[in-house]
Design a protein with these regions (language model features):
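Conserved PDZ fold ligand-binding element
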Residues: 134-156
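Membrane-embedded helix-turn/re-entrant segments that form the catalytic/gating core
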Residues: 26-107, 207-215, 310, 315
């Protein structure tokens, strides 16, 4: 069943992403040559109105190929009126941005469903560890965390991710007690038992039942949490604070999906669906953020070229841009192979 869940989740995320590109391309009059879900050999497909609609073997990617994009599939001479390069620069930008945007929209819709069924978690402290910084600062159970290092806190899970990523650095914490706001500076203390630095909050989170318009508010908080967690994790990778073992590819993600499904299945189909929907929400945000990185072959890399064009008033030759993106694509494939190899080694270790 793990493979089925993996295919369904990745298929939905990729479909949302590529449909975003497809829809805005149609709105902007750009001809879509191929709309594909998956990578590798073609399984099934059909041709309609000049577009090939294809499902490919590997459910880990997709493509929405525009006519003339990168100068690779357009005949020599002037671009046709419906080609990608013939469209105004802002039309092209919107068509590229739409992919990640639709991932965020999918994540928000899933978050609405999740919050509507299971509510959310208010950042209330449930316990204080004796002898740790929070205890020494006078914090008490029932205090509501409102900010950490000047970042607004809305969910209990944000407390964990912020303390975990903060490490041993001093942390400014703002909290509310009986309507009064307090601020304190906590210096994390190393815990031999947990193997990391702690500020001494022992459990946090108070269930909140979302009703009416508050469902949309808490759904936004859920997507915001996933978005910021992804950004912070990427920042750790860039700074060298995370190792290769902290990075997972498709194999590692499939393993997580399988473990979550195994734990949730005994509680019934609704609990299983909610857990898988939560994973899909996280992955959809993750894909949206990653695609906006300014790297060749990614949507963010294409946006860089188009923004340069918008500023300088003329495009970079499509053939040259195409070579840059092709090189970036090859590099990404090499990276994917490395990550998948690392996943497999961990799986059988």
């Amino acid at each position: 069943m793990t493979l089925i869940y993996f295919v369904l989740i990745f298929g939905a995320i990729v479909l949302a992403h590529e449909f975003g590109h497809y829809l805005l391309a149609k709105v902007n009059g750009i001809h879509v040559v191929e709309f594909a879900i998956g990578m590798g050999p073609k399984l099934v497909g059909f041709h309609k109105n000049g577009t090939d609609y294809v499902i490919r073997l590997l459910p880990i990617g997709g493509a929405c190929m525009f006519e003339g994009e990168d100068g690779l599939n357009e005949v020599q001479g002037e671009p046709s009126p419906n080609s990608f390069n013939a469209a105004p620069v802002w039309a092209r930008i919107s068509s590229v941005v739409a992919g990640p945007l639709f991932n965020f929209i999918l994540a928000f819709l899933l978050a609405i469903f999740l919050v509507g069924f299971s509510g959310s978690d208010k950042p209330v402290i449930l316990g204080i560890m004796e002898g740790y910084p929070a205890d020494e600062a006078g914090m008490e159970p029932g205090d509501v965390i409102t900010r950490m290092n000047d970042e607004k806190i809305y969910l209990a899970r944000e407390i964990y991710i912020n303390t975990y990523l903060n490490g041993d650095k001093p942390m400014k914490v703002e909290y509310e007690r009986n309507g009064e706001i307090f601020t304190t500076q906590l210096v994390p203390k190393y815990s031999e038992e947990s193997g990391r630095h702690l500020i001494g909050l022992q459990g946090y989170g108070e269930a909140v039942e979302a009703k009416g318009l508050s469902v949309f508010k808490y759904a936004y908080y859920e997507v915001r949490y996933s978005f910021l967690s992804t950004i912070k994790s990427l920042a750790m990778l860039v700074r060298g604070e995370a190792s290769k073992d902290d990075v997972s590819g498709p194999v590692g993600i499939a393993q997580v999906i399988g473990e979550v499904a195994e734990e949730a299945t005994p509680y019934g189909p609704l609990v299983l669906f909610l857990n898988l929907a939560n994973i899909a929400m996280l992955l959809s945000v993750n894909l949206g953020v990653l695609n906006l990185l300014p790297l060749p072959a990614l949507d963010g890399g294409r946006l860089v070229f188009m923004l340069i064009e918008a500023v300088r008033g003329k495009p970079i030759p499509p053939e040259k841009e195409g070579m840059v993106h092709f090189a970036g694509f090859v590099a990404l494939m090499v990276l994917m192979v490395f990550v998948m190899y690392n996943d497999i080694v961990r799986l059988f270790a």
